[in-house]
């Protein structure tokens, strides 16, 4: 049974402005593994990756119903499976989780569905 669904839409240029003012912003949002992937990319790809992880994590906290505050960005990790699809590899949710991240132009959208294991 679906117990939560969260959606987030983010402008990549807004993330770029924050990142330009404070490059440590990436360290606040990304886990160590996510940060290692981020640092392997050229600048423009870094921005879309960072915006995608931001949006995915925002969608997750909307789905679980806590918002950022009770959870931190470090409590949630989004990596890619062998096919390159994003997966939630770390979160406090014990059921099944499904994530989709899409980029189009200056926008990134993420959707997270949480499902009870029952």
Curated annotation (Swiss-Prot):
Its EC number is 2.7.8.7. InterPro entries: 4-PPantetheinyl_Trfase_dom, 4-PPantetheinyl_Trfase_dom_sf, ACPS, Ppantetheine-prot_Trfase_dom. Mg(2+) binds at residues 8, 58. Pfam families: ACPS. Keywords: Cytoplasm, Fatty acid biosynthesis, Fatty acid metabolism, Lipid biosynthesis, Lipid metabolism, Magnesium, Metal-binding, Transferase. GO terms for cellular component: cytoplasm. It catalyses: apo-[ACP] + CoA = holo-[ACP] + adenosine 3',5'-bisphosphate + H(+). Its main location: cytoplasm. Its cofactor is Mg(2+). GO terms for biological process: fatty acid biosynthetic process. The keyword Cytoplasm applies. Belongs to the P-Pant transferase superfamily. AcpS family. Transfers the 4'-phosphopantetheine moiety from coenzyme A to a Ser of acyl-carrier-protein. This is Holo-[acyl-carrier-protein] synthase. It comes from Streptococcus pyogenes serotype M12 (strain MGAS2096).
